[in-house]
Amino acid sequence: MKKRYLAMLPFLAAALLAPISQAQAPVFQITPVQSTVKFSVKASVAIEGNFEKWDATLTFTSPDVTTGVLDIKIQAASVNTGSGMKDDKLRSKDFFDAANDPLITFKSTKIVQTGPNTFDVPGTFTIRGVSKPETLTLVVSGVGTGSGTIKGTMAFDRKDYGMNSGIPFIKIADRVEVTVNLTGKRISGPPLVVKK
């Protein structure tokens, strides 16, 4: 009997410590109505737009901001440039191929603080089923308070992801710029801690 209790001690300790560890991690909630995911491409006729359907989560394992993981999932078919013709072309197999690969995703692999409120966030970017490493550059406000904003920018070469076609009568560049504006609030746990 005594041996059985001793054998159970590690499992009991893990069960007791797990809630304490989780309670020490801040929990954030992104507010979609106050957030946007936009893109732009230089062209003979300006191409810029946003995605109307997407989801973003920001999770932490401790109050240290560099332990965070940013996970963004975008529904490619929700693209909106204000032009039905452009939207249909971008949804097609020449660009997003939304019918076969409905999600555009970015998931961070680490967060590196580069200044008092700036961060480089390398991660895996996937579009059209092609995944490559890309980096979001973030400017964050409200760190350490109950709410804040994140402005992230990233640029990628569309041809790296198999988007080699053009749009009829429009000359477009290869470089695509993405801007992510996220507003969120801390719903539980301690404030985030950053280096000054």
What are these regions (language model features)?
Residues M1-R4:
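Positively charged n-region of N-terminal signal peptides that target proteins for export
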Residues L6-M8, G162:
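General helical structural elements
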Residues Q22-K196:
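Low-complexity, acidic/polar, glycine-enriched regions of mature
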Residues M8-A18:
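Bacterial N-terminal signal peptides
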